[in-house]
């Protein structure tokens, strides 16, 4: 590598400073978006609690086992719902999610796999592989989560399970584990089981009695549809928050690295300038001595 002049080094430092300003700005923006995403999760919690409570009561008081969404079948066709990001610059956010999905795919080599993808990154990754992509949604997280997309995907998944086009549906997304960590998660989406709801709502009052007015099947279909849509919506909320956290951390690390590089190149610059000054002094002294 050729030796850089002080001017070249100074230019390099200026470039790193510009990059640092960009990464720091992206960190600040991601932090603001993270707070907003966390607020959305918090606001959805009361609705979530009541919905799980209602589903738990349905299990306790209504014969749900004859409903097609509760029936288990031999696993011949498996659908995966993969919720990724539309953008990069978020550390291992997408990479770790894909590793978890790929690990699951290796565990079911004899099943026909169908993919439902949310996010550009998952679409780019899996469109290059031999899996069948049934549906793909992009720009879901541009501002607020587009609930029309949630309902469309939810209806499609429910229909596929009812029509026995798939025998099992698994949902993959990133979730915040604590305020400072996130991880990819895998959960069964369909069929629904008592354990799915009971884990969320353990303190069930079995004395509560529901009077069903109207067609029980229609009412059950409506409630289950709302419940399944909420599962998707909650997964997208969690993924959105985890993405902003991952990007905030990645940009913070990039800013710190840039700061370290500036310090390193500043030392190199000072050394190069000192060497240049020393060389000039030697030339002056040598020239003066030659004139004597």
Swiss-Prot record:
Compartments it resides in: Cell inner membrane
Main localisation: membrane
Keywords carried by this UniProt record: ATP synthesis, Cell inner membrane, Cell membrane, CF(1), Hydrogen ion transport, Ion transport, Membrane, Transport
Any single Gene Ontology cellular-component annotation: proton-transporting ATP synthase complex
Keyword Membrane: yes
GO BP annotation list: proton motive force-driven plasma membrane ATP synthesis
Domain of life of the native organism: Bacteria
Record bears the keyword Ion transport: yes
Topology class, membrane: Peripheral membrane protein
InterPro entries listed in its UniProt record: ATP_synth_F1_ATPase_gsu, ATP_synth_F1_gsu
Cross-referenced Pfam families: ATP-synt
GO MF assignments: ATP binding; proton-transporting ATP synthase activity, rotational mechanism
UniProt record similarity statement: Belongs to the ATPase gamma chain family.
PANTHER family attached to this UniProt entry: ATP SYNTHASE GAMMA CHAIN, ATP SYNTHASE SUBUNIT GAMMA, MITOCHONDRIAL
Function according to Swiss-Prot or TrEMBL: Produces ATP from ADP in the presence of a proton gradient across the membrane. The gamma chain is believed to be important in regulating ATPase activity and the flow of protons through the CF(0) complex.
Known partners and oligomeric status: F-type ATPases have 2 components, CF(1) - the catalytic core - and CF(0) - the membrane proton channel. CF(1) has five subunits: alpha(3), beta(3), gamma(1), delta(1), epsilon(1). CF(0) has three main subunits: a, b and c.
NCBIfam families: ATPsyn_F1gamma (TIGR01146), PRK14110.1 (NF010708)
Official protein name in the record: ATP synthase gamma chain
Organism field: Hydrogenobaculum sp. (strain Y04AAS1)
């Amino acid at each position: 590598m050729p030796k850089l002049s002080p001017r070249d080094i100074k230019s390099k430092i200026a470039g790193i400073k510009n990059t640092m300003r960009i990464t720091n700005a992206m960190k600040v923006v991601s932090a603001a978006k993270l707070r907003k995403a966390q607020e959305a999760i918090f606001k959805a919690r009361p609705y979530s609690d009541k919905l799980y409570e209602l589903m738990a009561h349905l299990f306790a008081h209504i014969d749900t086992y004859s409903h097609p969404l509760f029936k288990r079948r031999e696993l011949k066709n498996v659908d995966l719902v993969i919720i990724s990001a539309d953008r990069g610059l978020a550390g291992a956010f997408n990479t770790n999610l894909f590793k978890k999905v790929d690990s699951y795919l290796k565990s079911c080599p004899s099943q026909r796999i169908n993919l439902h993808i949310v996010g550009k990154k998952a679409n780019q990754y899996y469109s290059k592989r031999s899996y069948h992509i049934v549906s793909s949604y992009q720009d879901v997280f541009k501002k607020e989560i587009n609930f029309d997309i949630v309902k469309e995907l939810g209806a499609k998944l429910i229909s596929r399970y009812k029509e026995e086009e798939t025998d099992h549906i698994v949902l993959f997304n990133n979730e915040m584990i604590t305020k400072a960590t996130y991880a990819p998660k895998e959960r069964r989406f369909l069929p629904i089981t008592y354990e799915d709801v009971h884990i969320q709502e353990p303190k069930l009052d079995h004395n509560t009695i529901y009077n069903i007015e109207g067609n029980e099947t229609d009412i059950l279909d409506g409630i289950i549809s709302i419940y399944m849509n909420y599962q998707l919506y909650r997964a997208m909320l969690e993924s959105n928050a985890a993405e902003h956290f991952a990007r905030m951390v990645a940009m913070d690390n990039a800013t710190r690295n840039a700061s370290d590089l500036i310090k390193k190149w500043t030392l190199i610059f000072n050394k190069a300038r000192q060497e240049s000054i020393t060389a000039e002094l030697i030339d002056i002294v040598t020239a003066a001595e030659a004139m004597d």
